[in-house]
């Protein structure tokens, strides 16, 4: 079984993760355009949940397409 995760960059597509990568992750942080464009969002597959830097938000999940882009989620 291989997991389906959304991956950036845009266009954001759900892709099959490589064997051994059984988590989807969402990583968000602010860059210099944060006030006008919002947070930078990185989506992808991982074998282990990426470690979080102090300025980042990282969430991981383990079901197909469980990491949609925050702006694409219904409110």
From Swiss-Prot:
The keyword RNA-binding does not apply. The keyword Disulfide bond applies. It is found in: Secreted. Keywords: Acetylcholine receptor inhibiting toxin, Disulfide bond, Ion channel impairing toxin, Neurotoxin, Postsynaptic neurotoxin, Secreted, Signal, Toxin. Disulfide bonds join 5-24, 17-45, 30-34, 49-60, 61-66. GO terms for cellular component: extracellular region. GO terms for molecular function: acetylcholine receptor inhibitor activity; ion channel regulator activity; toxin activity. Gene3D superfamilies: CD59. Expressed by the venom gland. Residues 1-2 form the signal peptide. Monomer in solution, homodimer in crystal state. Belongs to the three-finger toxin family. Long-chain subfamily. Type II alpha-neurotoxin sub-subfamily. Binds to muscular and neuronal nicotinic acetylcholine receptor (nAChR) and inhibits acetylcholine from binding to the receptor, thereby impairing neuromuscular and neuronal transmission. Blocks muscle type nAChR. Also binds with high affinity to alpha-7/CHRNA7 nAChRs. In addition, shows a weak inhibition of neuronal alpha-3-beta-2/CHRNA3-CHRNB2 nAChR. Selectively binds to alpha-1-delta subunit interface of the mouse muscle nicotinic acetylcholine receptor, with a 10-fold higher affinity for the adult than for the fetal receptors. This is Alpha-elapitoxin-Bc2b. It comes from Bungarus candidus. The lineage of its organism: Eukaryota, Metazoa, Chordata, Craniata, Vertebrata.
């Amino acid at each position: 079984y291989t997991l389906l995760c959304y991956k950036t960059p845009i266009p954001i597509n759900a892709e099959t993760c490589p064997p051994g990568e059984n988590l989807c992750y969402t990583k968000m942080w602010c860059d210099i355009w944060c006030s006008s464009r919002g947070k930078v969002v990185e989506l992808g597959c991982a074998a282990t949940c990426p470690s979080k830097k102090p300025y980042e938000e990282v969430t991981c999940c383990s079901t197909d397409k469980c990491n949609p882009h925050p702006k694409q989620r219904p409110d």
